[in-house]
Amino acid sequence: MIAGNITPKEVYPMREYVIMTDSCCDLTDHMAKELELAVVPLTVHIDGHDYPNLLDGSAISFEDFYGKIRGGVLATTAAANVGQFQEAMRPILAAGKDIVSINFSSALSTTYQSACIAAQDMK
C-alpha cells in the first residue's frame, strides 16, 4: 500500500497496529502488499525530473531508471517529508490503529526525522 491510498476500512481489521516503512525498504510491491505494509515513497531525482519512488515502478519504469544510470545519468533521492508521513498516518490512526514505523537510517537521510516529527504532530 502506498501512502494516501489507504482508507480506514482497509486498515487491517485483525491487527491492532500497522507497520509503516518508506520506499528504501528494499521490498517489492508484491511483498509490501502481502505483508500489508504502509509505504511512504521517497523522491528520486534523475535526468532533470522528480519521480516518487514507488515500489511498483509506475512513476518511472525500472528499465528506464536503470537505462539512465547505465547511460551515466546521476540519480539522487530526497527524503519523504513530514506531510507525506502525516497523510499516510491519518487514516490508520482514524481507524484506531497504532503505527510501528521502520524507516531509512537517520545517519543517511532525514526520512526518520520526518516520521518522528509527523508522529509527534499527530498525537
Feature annotation, model-predicted:
Residues N81-I92, A115-A118:
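Short, charged beta->alpha transition segments
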Residues P91-I99:
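Glycine-rich phosphate-binding loop signature in dinucleotide/nucleotide-binding domains
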Residues A79-Q86, F104-T110:
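N-terminal glycine-rich "phosphate-gripper" loop used for MgATP/nucleotide binding
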Residues S23, N103-F104:
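Small/polar loops that bind or transfer phosphate-bearing groups
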Residues F104-M122:
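Short Gly/Thr/Asp-enriched flexible loops that form oxyanion-binding sites at enzyme active sites
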Residues K33, L93, Q120:
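Anion (oxyanion) recognition and catalysis
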Residues M1-P13:
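Short, Lys/Arg-enriched N-terminal segments with co-localized hydrophobic residues
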Residues V18-A79, Q84:
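N-terminal glycine-rich anion-binding loop in soluble enzyme alpha/beta folds
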